[in-house]
């Protein structure tokens, strides 16, 4: 395969997030000195979209995924305008922080995305939540991973289509001080088993905020974050086991194995986004049988509206 190339609270509440460590290594300090000297931060430039597969087939499916950090706040920040311009066939949203009976009416204005499915905690308003919006009606839709311990927070939607199964997920954060790390490890094991079973029946696409930076290249300050949520050895190992056991491929790294400074999350603190001090926490993972259909995996880092940016997948099915 050729290779190419937290915050002020929103009005809909927020989930505590672990922020990047501010303490800098000597190497990071040198980078900061260079930036101060006028070189500026190293920003990621999303290359032109590749809309053909390795065999030359044209893309037939476009999927977007975005952690919106609260639907209502995201809409106020013109997130829907970006979606209308991007025009995906399927839109997956995470951290919606909105129960289904309080969904903003503006969502019905999205052109073509008429089949809409939502999951939210039954007892926690303004927390977690995921959504899946599609032009085509799925053959089947289900919610959660089938284990009561892990299905109380509205974190997973599964949609089966003719040639693949799509899972969108908002994976639990290990929390400040790693207070939920033990729970996260239990989640990782249960989620891995659930996905392996799904993938044994039909090719799988997993997308969403998976709340882990897999390798050092996937965050700006790896040395200072090894004991922070999202980059602990346990979480990284769990992600690696997910890739191997299901098995799945990281679509972005498959196409861009050595591309650095490509992030999808930046804390609202310390002007992190303008400095591109970020983390790659959002992914499209694919069954290996889908790799011949992979055209491109995009990070839309210039799209605003959340502390995450959207990502886009092109497939030629």
Swiss-Prot record:
Positions annotated to bind Mg(2+) 1: 69, 95, 307
Segments for region (Disordered): 1-58
Naturally occurring in which organism (per UniProt): Mus musculus (Mouse)
Regulation: NPM1 stimulates endodeoxyribonuclease activity on double-stranded DNA with AP sites, but inhibits endoribonuclease activity on single-stranded RNA containing AP sites.
Identification of the protein by name: DNA repair nuclease/redox regulator APEX1
CDD domains: Ape1-like_AP-endo (cd09087)
Record site feature (Important for substrate recognition), residues: 211
Interaction with DNA substrate (site feature) positions: 308
Keyword NADP listed: no
Region described as Necessary for interaction with YBX1, binding to RNA, association together with NPM1 to rRNA, endoribonuclease activity on abasic RNA and localization in the nucleoli: 2-32
Cofactor: binding details: Probably binds two magnesium or manganese ions per subunit.
Active site positions: 170, 209
Chain positions of motif Nuclear localization signal (NLS): 8-12
